[in-house]
Amino acid sequence: MAKKVVGYIKLQIPAGKATPAPPVGPALGQHGVNIMAFCKEFNERTAKDAGLVIPVVITVYADRSFSFVTKTPPASVLIKRACKIEKGSGRPNREKVAKISKEEVRKIAEMKMPDLNAASLEAAMSMIAGTARSMGVVVED
């Protein structure tokens, strides 16, 4: 029989840098999860993605065991990395901070495809382009 699920915890943690300090420790501690075991396993799984923020969904079971699924980094983080900028524009309609090519948008869309609810690559590309525009990044043809 399957284990009884007690709760789900969603966090965004820098790859390879999970520590028992907030926000990880308190979120896991209130569910009674072994914090060090999670941190060690997460850091091993995400060591190759250093420098990116990785969303993770942790499933906590009644016997205080856990399992977790890592997702692809947020589109905004990938766009900022592709454009080599620190942050998006505070006023995206008036102030443009960078430019991104269609090829880079395609690469990001291919990387994000498993986590997006898009039927085709073109639909995923338009989602990524919309995120870029909302950050003040111009998408070039």
Swiss-Prot record:
Disulfide bonds: none
Example of a GO MF term: structural constituent of ribosome
GO terms for biological process, alphabetical: translation
GO CC list: cytosolic large ribosomal subunit
Any matching Pfam family: Ribosomal_L11
Signal sequence bounds: none
Top-level division of the source organism's lineage: Bacteria
PTM comment text: One or more lysine residues are methylated.
InterPro entries, per the entry: Ribosomal_uL11, Ribosomal_uL11_bac-typ, Ribosomal_uL11_C, Ribosomal_uL11_C_sf, Ribosomal_uL11_N, Ribosomal_uL11_N_sf
Keywords associated with the record: Methylation, Ribonucleoprotein, Ribosomal protein, RNA-binding, rRNA-binding
Keyword rRNA-binding: yes
Function noted in UniProt: Forms part of the ribosomal stalk which helps the ribosome interact with GTP-bound translation factors.
Subunit structure: Part of the ribosomal stalk of the 50S ribosomal subunit. Interacts with L10 and the large rRNA to form the base of the stalk. L10 forms an elongated spine to which L12 dimers bind in a sequential fashion forming a multimeric L10(L12)X complex.
Family: Belongs to the universal ribosomal protein uL11 family.
PANTHER family: 60S RIBOSOMAL PROTEIN L12, LARGE RIBOSOMAL SUBUNIT PROTEIN UL11M
NCBIfam families, alphabetized: L11_bact
Protein's recorded name: Large ribosomal subunit protein uL11
